A protein has these predicted regions:
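Short, charged amphipathic recognition helices of the HTH superfamily
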Residues: 43-53
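Active-site-proximal, Lys/Arg-enriched surface segment
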Residues: 37, 65-144
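Short amphipathic alpha-helical segments
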Residues: 34, 48-49, 65-66
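Short, basic interhelical loop/turn and adjoining N-cap
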Residues: 55-67
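Polybasic, low-complexity association/targeting segments
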Residues: 52-56, 265
Length: 417
């Protein structure tokens, strides 16, 4: 395919995807979502002004901006889009797919008039500032680099409908589970080490791997013991070398693994504490519902499933960096939530929806940019794809409104990338 053909296919796929997301909504909503996706992908920006500029309409720019802002405020638009993204992604979730819950933030350092601004901890600068929280769910396989963006929602503790961070986490889990059922293994970092999350997880019979804080009490052989004390005394019969890819290169760790069978105080469920050493001063403690036996394969599956977070952390940051989410400038809370849902849909479009044959075409034409990302950056292809899509769409002379929806290729016929 030449450049114009690839650009045409991309526009058609955006139209097709937007139609899928907005099924059951007014036609004008589907048009808006398609335009928003096109603008975000072609400008790599969440600014309404940039999205408006990408459409190149034969009217004053402010008129286009006003129309987009009105549509962005459509009630429950984000909720409908999120539901459709989960529905699309659920097709790819298998029994052992890792469902990684990732809390994050959108920092607005200089904002003053955005609705329900709240205190957040800036994860990159390790400081407290103004902004919003997000919770996302990303599917991943242990043996591949592919990710499945499933869910993302922005919230504020200052909003009238806010209950708690635990409620937002459980809302994410329940919404995804409505589509994936019992498939998948839920993975959380230390933010999941809370009784108010463990109890609902166990009540729902969810398979999970959660990293523990050292001060968590567990029941071992009938006695309450600190998790850290159990970990320090745990036999470590197996070892493995793991590689962490960083911006400066690769770092090799030699880890050792062991386990103890435990319970949570006040609960009857048999759980397993998997202990991993070699990554830092204190051992890594993972509490899981998975069936674990004394074998290298069984223990390493749990350890490597959690460490899979390393490999996709950069990809999880992909949306934040590639589309400059923290540059978002709408003031109303519902519009903010709707825009985040559309950005999440754009990430899903790049990572999952696009047929592999089209991804190959984009990467082939954009080989130089892709090559620059081969070394030191995990999962470079998503960044390269985003850059390639931007280059094709920006260089296209045909207005987006002239694009026609393209039929989607059968997933079974797609080439592996």
């Amino acid at each position: 395919m030449n450049r114009s053909q690839v650009a045409g296919k991309l526009k058609g796929q955006i139209c097709q995807f937007a139609g899928k997301l907005c099924k059951g909504l007014p036609k004008v909503a589907g048009r808006f979502v398609g335009e928003a996706l096109y603008g975000i992908l072609s400008k790599q920006s969440v600014r309404v002004s940039e999205v408006a500029r990408s459409l190149n309409e034969p009217i004053r720019l402010i008129k286009t901006e006003n129309r987009l802002c009105r549509e962005l405020g459509r009630r429950e638009l984000g909720e409908r889009i999120t539901e459709k993204v989960i529905e699309e992604g659920a097709f790819h979730v298998k029994k052992d797919t890792l469902l990684i819950i990732d809390p994050s933030d959108v920092t607005k350092k200089y904002a003053k008039k955005m609705e329900y601004l709240a205190e957040v901890r800036d994860g990159s600068e390790k400081t407290i500032g103004k902004g919003y929280w997000t919770v996302r769910v990303v599917g991943a396989e242990l043996e591949t680099v592919k990710i499945i963006p499933l869910y993302e929602r922005l919230y504020s503790q200052e909003a009238p409908d806010y209950d708690s961070e635990n409620t937002e986490t459980l809302k994410a889990v329940d919404r995804v589970r409505r589509h994936v059922g019992d498939r998948g293994i839920w993975v959380m970092n230390r933010g999941g080490d809370r009784r108010k999350l463990f109890a609902p997880f166990l009540d729902r019979e969810i398979g999970f791997i959660v990293r523990l804080e050292g001060d968590r009490h567990l029941v071992y052989r009938g006695r309450k013991v600190l998790a850290l004390d159990l970990a320090v005394s745990c036999p470590m019969p197996y070892w493995e070398r793991v590689i962490k890819e960083e911006r400066t290169g690769e770092k090799v760790y030699t880890i050792q693994v062991g386990f103890r069978r435990v319970r949570l105080p006040g609960r009857s469920e048999q759980l397993v504490l998997v202990v991993v050493t070699g990554l830092g001063i204190e051992p890594l403690m993972l509490l899981t519902t998975l069936k674990v036996v004394k074998s290298r394969k069984s223990l390493l599956f749990v350890a490597l499933s959690y460490l899979r977070r390393w490999q996709i952390e950069e990809t999880i940051r992909f949306a934040k960096q590639a589309f400059r989410i923290e540059d978002i400038r709408v003031r109303k809370y519902e519009r903010l939530q709707n825009m985040i849902a559309i950005v999440a849909a754009a990430v899903h479009f790049v990572a999952v929806w696009l047929g592999e044959w089209l991804k190959l075409g984009i990467l082939a034409h954009h080989a130089l940019e892709a090559a620059k990302r081969l070394f030191g950056i995990p999962n470079f292809r998503y960044y390269a794809l985003a850059d390639g899509i931007k280059a094709f769409l920006e260089g296209s002379e045909t207005p987006f409104r002239a694009a026609k929806a393209q039929p989607r290729a059968d997933p079974q016929l797609m080439l592996p990338i």
